[in-house]
Amino acid sequence: MNSGGSDSFDYLLQLTKALSAECRANRQETDRIELLLKRLAKQSGISYDNLSKNIIPDSWKDNASQKASPPTEAQKLISENFKLIYEIEKQEYFNTKAVALINNINEHFSYIKNFIDEQNAIRERNIATFSSEKLDERNKSLQQNYESLKTENEETKKKLHSIIKQFEKLLKEVDWDRISKDSRDYSRFKKQLEYLQDTYQVLK
């Protein structure tokens, strides 16, 4: 379908919707007038048929004895158009609700993702800080014990060896992949390890 045909169809659809809404409004107004006349007849003690005889056209009145004539082709087409308009309006309503629901779900997913990313970032910073602090404490303890034990006997050497093994074990327990290699704490700790190795040759 070319753009001109599409524009014409859209215009016809909007016009048909407007006519449909106007017909519904007119029908509601007709029903309202008929209801008011029935109330007036009841309050006045006058038969509704007598009251509406010269007011309401015969085409408005219900006549069970009259048999409805079969609908013409034009009436059938109009009825089908009204059904089509109703289906289109219903589909547009559901589409609007579906889009709103999808947007709402996407908003919640975005919020959850941002929350998880933020928590992961905080956890990684905490892990790096915690590891650095613990390693600093062990490093200080190692140096102090080394100074106090280096002049003692063979038993002292065994204790020193045990401390070194504990330190090596601690290094193996650290999850290095979760620590940023560009962080200040990691650079400082790496320098401390190099210092221990160069000064005391305690690490293999």
From Swiss-Prot:
The keyword Lyase does not apply. GO terms for biological process: cellular response to pheromone; re-entry into mitotic cell cycle after pheromone arrest; regulation of cell cycle. It comes from the Eukaryota. Keywords: Cell cycle, Endoplasmic reticulum. GO terms for cellular component: cell periphery; endoplasmic reticulum; endoplasmic reticulum membrane; FAR/SIN/STRIPAK complex; Golgi cis cisterna. The keyword Endoplasmic reticulum applies. It is found in: Endoplasmic reticulum. Its main location: endoplasmic reticulum. Participates in the control of the reentry into the cell cycle following pheromone treatment. Component of a complex at least composed of FAR3, FAR7, FAR8, FAR10, FAR11 and VPS64. Present with 1540 molecules/cell in log phase SD medium. This is Factor arrest protein 3. It comes from Saccharomyces cerevisiae (strain ATCC 204508 / S288c) (Baker's yeast).
